[in-house]
Amino acid sequence: AAAAPGAAGGAQLPLGNRERKAGCKNFFWKTFSSC
């Protein structure tokens, strides 16, 4: 589990895998324009 940055880190970090597309319009709009 600790060796899975895409699964564990993606769920905890705001810039993870699921948050990247889910919160893309939440906080990514101010950082990344080409979401």
Curated annotation (Swiss-Prot):
Q: Which domain of life is it from?
A: Eukaryota
Which InterPro entries does the UniProt record give?
Answer: Somatostatin/Cortistatin_C (IPR018142)
Disulphide bonds annotated for this chain are: 24-35
GO molecular function list:
hormone activity
Q: What's one Pfam family the UniProt record gives for this protein? A: Somatostatin
As given in the record, the signal peptide range reads none
GO cellular component, alphabetical, reads: extracellular region
The compartments listed are: Secreted
Q: Which UniProt keywords apply?
A: Cleavage on pair of basic residues, Disulfide bond, Hormone, Secreted
Predominant subcellular localization, coarse grouping: secreted
The entry's family comment says: Belongs to the somatostatin family.
UniProt function note: Somatostatin inhibits the release of somatotropin.
What is the official name of this protein in its record?
Somatostatin
Name the gene: sst
